Design a protein with these regions (language model features):
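Ribokinase/PfkB-type carbohydrate-kinase core domain
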Residues: 1-4, 57-59, 65-68, 82-207, ...
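Substrate-binding N-lobe of the ribokinase-like
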Residues: 2, 12-78, 84-85
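Active-site metal-binding loops of divalent metal-dependent hydrolases
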Residues: 7-9, 170, 226
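A short, flexible beta-alpha/helix-coil linker loop
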Residues: 10-13, 214-216
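Residues at secondary-structure transition points
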Residues: 18-22, 49, 153, 218, ...
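Conserved sugar-transfer catalytic core signal across GT-A, GT-B, and GT-C glycosyltransferases
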Residues: 23, 27, 131, 216
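Active-site catalytic pocket residues across diverse enzymes, especially alpha/beta-hydrolases
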Residues: 35, 135, 235
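Conserved phosphate-binding/catalytic region of the ribokinase-like
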Residues: 178-264
Length: 264
């Protein structure tokens, strides 16, 4: 089995601490510990010290790195701030996209997508439309993190391609996800609700999972990526939505206990 994720790899810059991160890096590092599948990352880092930090962080992980390119320029970086309760937040000038912003898929990258048993990406990434095009050319299971997107008219345009849809939500999001799940019966909609757990919809049926208990929240960075990794690893193993939600919740709870998106 092949699981491929793309495209964001970056460093998260905290006060006095630089941590490897980005949705794809967090996801790959986490899911590689939960499955025997072959895990690939497609993306790029810059030829700078941050790029070395990213690559060094996953050198001992069971991740295939042949589709990670080192390009001239800056590795993407995100200046990350934490509230006293451990919730992360950003400022207008936090993000530097670096080589991530201009990354383009190669022919080899496209071939990998077509041979994957699950591809996981983000709606906000620069290669999202290319991934959709690849999927329409030759179908593969596709998981997409829509994060806080609320433009459901736009989301609906892509649902013919999406197997698993993750979105951070609220009550109106739940209502729209339920409606769409009855229409797009090949897509499982997973709405994460923070401390209120998560709700999934499949063919109009709702499934709810409470958040796993956490004694103390250190940092919420990478929590969503960990949930998605746990969910997908479990779902690919047995196709059970409720079991997958529970695994996602447990995996996210572990990530809340340390600084950064994954341990290395």
């Amino acid at each position: 089995m092949i699981i491929t994720t793309l495209t964001c790899m970056c460093v998260d810059i905290f006060d006095n601490t630089i941590m490897p991160g980005g949705e794809s890096l967090n996801f790959a590092a986490t899911i590689s510990r939960l499955t025997d599948a072959k895990v690939y990352i497609i993306g790029a880092v810059g030829n700078d010290s941050y790029g070395k930090t990213v690559l060094d962080s996953i050198k001992d992980f069971s991740i295939d790195k042949t589709h990670i390119r080192t390009e001239n320029g800056d590795t993407a970086s995100n200046r990350t701030y934490l509230t006293p309760d451990g919730d992360r937040y950003y400022k207008d000038d936090s993000w530097n996209g670096g080589v991530f912003s201009s990354f383009a898929l190669s022919a080899s990258d496209r071939e990998l997508l077509h041979s994957s048993d699950m591809v996981h990406t983000t709606f906000s990434g620069p290669n999202f439309n290319d991934v959709i095009s690849c999927c329409r050319e030759k179908r593969f299971p596709l998981s997409v993190d829509f994060d806080i997107c609320r433009d459901f008219d736009t989301i609906e345009k892509y649902l013919d391609c999406i197997s698993l849809l993750f979105i951070s939500g609220d009550k109106p999001t739940l209502e729209k996800a339920k409606r769409l799940s009855a229409k797009y019966t090949d897509t499982v909609f997973i709405v994460t609700l923070g401390e209120n757990g998560s709700t999934a919809f499949s063919k109009g049926t709702a499934y709810h999972c409470a958040a796993a208990e956490v004694s103390e929240v250190t940092d919420t960075t990478g929590c969503g990526d960990s949930y998605q990794a746990g969910f997908i690893a479990s779902y690919l193993a047995d196709g059970n939505i409720e079991t997958a939600m529970s695994k996602g919740s447990q995996t996210a709870a572990q990530t809340l206990s340390f600084i950064g998106g994954f341990r290395y």
